[in-house]
Amino acid sequence: MKILPHVMRNINEFNIPAGNSHGYEILYFGVNLILMFKYRLSFDIKVQNSAKEIEILILGRNDIPAWKENKDNSEIKPYYNKNGLKINDVFRPTISDAYAFVINNRKSSISHEVKTVEVILTHNWKQEVKESQLKEHIKTQG
């Protein structure tokens, strides 16, 4: 058995309107801590065109329908919650789950303001791989 590092990076730019109905963007990801050792999600968020902060939430995917309906989030316990113009942080989940990374502009006081947000997500983990799987992969690539 070998343990191989894995890295997956997503770079996006979103235009997120204000308001409750469409003032957010959701990126889904899944983590299986049995297969993905030392998983971490690093993220770098930057509001490009505004002096008003954006909110970043990480929720369980099953909480998303309730979050969309609930304006104050009081019934939902997020795994992560932070506001800012620039957010550079790391999320290390403690349980395997399907997660939702939410860029939230629903609280914006300016109803017509569309925020341009640069989002860089980097998923890192280690995975145990059998030697035979490596050899088979090398054969198919060559």
Positions of PLM-derived features:
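Acidic, Ser/Thr/Pro
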Residues: 1-142
